[in-house]
A protein has these predicted regions:
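Short, basic/glycine-rich phosphate-binding loops at helix/coil junctions
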Residues: 74-82, 99-112
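Extracellular structured ligand-interaction cores
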Residues: 33, 139, 159
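Internal catalytic-core helix/loop-beta-alpha segment
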Residues: 103-136
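Short, amphipathic alpha-helical segments
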Residues: 35, 91-95, 120-124, 136, ...
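Active-site signature of cysteine proteases
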Residues: 123-129, 133-136, 145-206
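Structural recognition of the beta-strand scaffold that forms the well-ordered cores
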Residues: 113-114, 140-143, 173
Length: 206
């Protein structure tokens, strides 16, 4: 089975410049350096808003046809940054991410609950946490604190947005700095290596 949620393809001057947002679009130096958490929050908000009528207020724009417009998306990112403002060490806390995103949602009339998984002990534990959420149309926030894989050498201390999966290929699909990437989950959750990751997912509060 392969499934991919609708992550906005961001358009600027008639050209596609991003699969979701990119922290390099922020105007401030520190925002560009440490704004990945708020980009992931923005991606999750936009995916929810564009796929569910009852969640549309998470991306409050008057014309949904302009949801992929660069200026509109940057405005969402700037708003989310005020909720997820990083400290001098960045924003490396899954509990804080969950709390801040739920606060953003609450301020927009939507009550969410969250679950967090830190340092999954096996590939199976990680996938049992991630895949059911995606199958139920919930994007997943993923924090890479430290990972020894060569493929992830540029991605330590970084948030990405998981938007899909391919069970046959054994890959996760995510938005990373505005790029759509497919990542081998056997590499990502290789228990022979010491890695530090955290995962956050949301759902409607019952």
């Amino acid at each position: 089975m392969r499934k991919e949620l609708h992550c906005p393809q961001i358009i600027k001057d008639g050209k596609t410049i991003g699969y979701g947002g990119d922290q390099e679009w922020f105007p401030g130096d520190f925002q560009r350096l440490a704004g990945c958490g708020s980009v992931t929050g923005s991606n999750i908000a936009a995916i929810y808003a564009l796929s569910r009528e009852d969640f549309k207020d998470l991306y409050p724009i008057k014309d949904s046809q302009k949801a992929a417009d660069y200026e509109q998306y940057l405005n969402l990112m700037q708003t989310m940054y005020r909720y997820m403002k990083p400290g001098f060490m960045g924003y490396p806390l899954i509990g804080r991410f969950a709390k801040d995103f739920k606060r953003y949602a609450k301020d927009h009339g939507i009550t969410l609950s969250s679950e967090q998984l830190f340092l999954p002990q096996s590939r199976e534990q990680a996938l049992d946490f991630i895949l059911p959420a995606l199958k139920e149309d919930h994007p997943v926030a993923f924090l890479i604190l430290r990972h020894p894989a060569h493929e992830l050498r540029e991605d330590n201390w970084h948030w990405v947005t998981i938007t899909g999966f391919d069970e046959e290929e054994e890959k996760l699909i995510w938005s990373h700095c505005g790029e759509c990437e497919e990542i081998d989950w056997n590499m990502l959750f290789d228990t022979d290596k010491k890695y530090y990751v955290g995962i956050v997912k949301f759902k409607e509060e019952e």
